Swiss-Prot record:
Its EC number is 2.5.1.55. InterPro entries: Aldolase_TIM, DAHP1/KDSA, KDO8P_synthase. The keyword Transferase applies. Keywords: Cytoplasm, Lipopolysaccharide biosynthesis, Transferase. Transmembrane segments: none annotated. GO terms for molecular function: 3-deoxy-8-phosphooctulonate synthase activity. It comes from the Bacteria. This is 2-dehydro-3-deoxyphosphooctonate aldolase. It is found in: Cytoplasm.
């Protein structure tokens, strides 16, 4: 490992800049990569919305949902099929792309076509995976495990910076509160900003997830996504992570907590208003 370096206070993915004191940016897209046509449909719609609103947007989707509740659940198209789709979205639509990785060997290949590698919450302490992601030189977004205290993320980030990569994002996505339930502690946002020094993202859709709550799949309460998103942005964050879908009720995964695409623009517009107020008066820069 290299000598530890400090995480960057702002990171740039394509034309999108994340920083706790900078204007709000968005990471958005469907839970999983369903098809090329579906991915391009959603990405095109999101680009139009972001352009109208004047906000930076990173497209996200998963080529493999490797931690589904049931072995029978749909997992996605896989990395081989995903890479040309990711490249098309990035190169032809001009949107930076984020996807999650689950195995060390996936990192270098995924990095060929995406701007941000995401470490899933369940894997956030897997040292070798963090190092493999860091070694690509891409931005690494680490989801805080539902089992971790926010101050524990300092050790997670230090694994990446010890590998010589200062481009880190940390994401809050709720903490376990009894069985099949997550809650959001808004104190975690400034705590992670202070402890890690990295830009902080709030995942508003997975925070309303009910893990395993439907027996063979996870449930969710999407009606609370706007509530938690407004609260997080009022605290002050670098960005929000929001999964969205044209027809969430028929999505292959995480439908109960995804925001319908038709409601996405109004939500982001409101969050931008909250963000402007929070950062105008914040003394914590922003968290």
């Amino acid at each position: 490992m290299n000598k530890s370096i400090a995480p960057a206070t702002s990171v740039v993915a394509g034309n999108v800049k994340f920083g706790n004191a900078l204007p709000l940016s968005v990471i958005a897209g469907p839970c999983q990569l369903e098809s090329r046509a579906h991915a391009l449909e959603v990405a095109s719609a999101l680009k139009e919305i972001a352009t109208r609103l004047g906000i930076g947007l990173v497209y996200k989707t998963s080529f493999d949902k490797a931690n589904r509740t049931s072995a029978a659940s749909a997992r996605g198209l896989g990395l081989d099929a995903a890479l040309p789709i990711f490249a098309e979205i990035r190169d032809h639509l001009g949107l930076p792309v984020l996807t999650d990785v689950h195995e060390n060997e996936q990192c270098a290949r995924a990095a060929e076509a995406v701007d941000i590698l995401q470490i899933p919450a369940f894997l956030c302490r897997q040292t070798d995976l963090l190092l493999a992601a860091a070694a690509t030189g891409r931005i690494v977004n680490v989801k805080k495990g539902q089992f971790l205290a926010p101050w524990d993320m300092g050790n997670v980030v230090s694994k990446i910076t010890h590998a010589g990569n200062s481009k880190v994002l940390v994401t809050e996505r709720g903490v376990s509160f009894g069985y099949n339930t997550l809650v959001s502690d808004m104190r975690a946002l400034p705590i992670m900003a202070k402890t890690t020094g990295a830009p902080v993202i709030f995942d508003a859709t997975h925070s309303v997830q009910q893990p395993g709550g439907k027996g063979t799949s996870s449930g969710g309460e999407r009606e609370y996504v706007p509530v938690l998103a407004r609260a997080a942005v009022a605290v002050g964050v670098a960005g929000v992570f929001i999964e969205t879908h044209p027809d969430p009720d028929h999505a292959p995964s995480d439908g109960p907590n995804m925001v319908p695409l038709r409601e996405f623009e109004a939500l982001i517009k409101t969050l931008m208003e909250f963000d402007a107020l929070a950062k105008k008066r914040s003394t914590v820069g922003a968290v």
